Amino acid sequence: MKQTKIFKITLSGLLLALGIVLPFLTGMQLGSVLCPMHIPILLCGIICGWQYGLLIGIICPLLRSVIVGMPPIYPTAISMSVELGIYGFVSGLLFEKLKNKNLNLLLVCFISLISAQLLGRLGWGLVRFIMGLIDKTNVFTFSAFLSGAFIVAWPGILAQLIIIPILIIS
């Protein structure tokens, strides 16, 4: 199916709505473990392109914060906007560049996803660290970064690496 601009805008809107609604299924505690808002953003980048993935990634946590009150705008929604913006950008850009290189589509998915996850989490950690420097009451340590980015979130990372390639390949 030839993807038109209207299709990409429509699908991006649908994925944005999904990013706002999916966290209701997990609740707050399980949401930080399963990262349900991340899946629609990664899909948006891969399917619609890096421009849409970047935009929807930035908008989704901020819009959800305004509409629902969760995540809190500061520091969580702001740092998540950077993280998810990077997710959408990197997943879309790498998928676009690698899919025509005679590589297995599954391999392209994994390279795009893992790169986006690593860079997005680094962006999240950097923003949280800078916020901690500015706001001395919100200090963000390296152990807090490792815990929040990888240790607590590993089930969500694994779920993304399983669910997204299945959806892309099917």
Report residues per predicted region:
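Loop-helix junctions at membrane interfaces
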Residues: 1-170
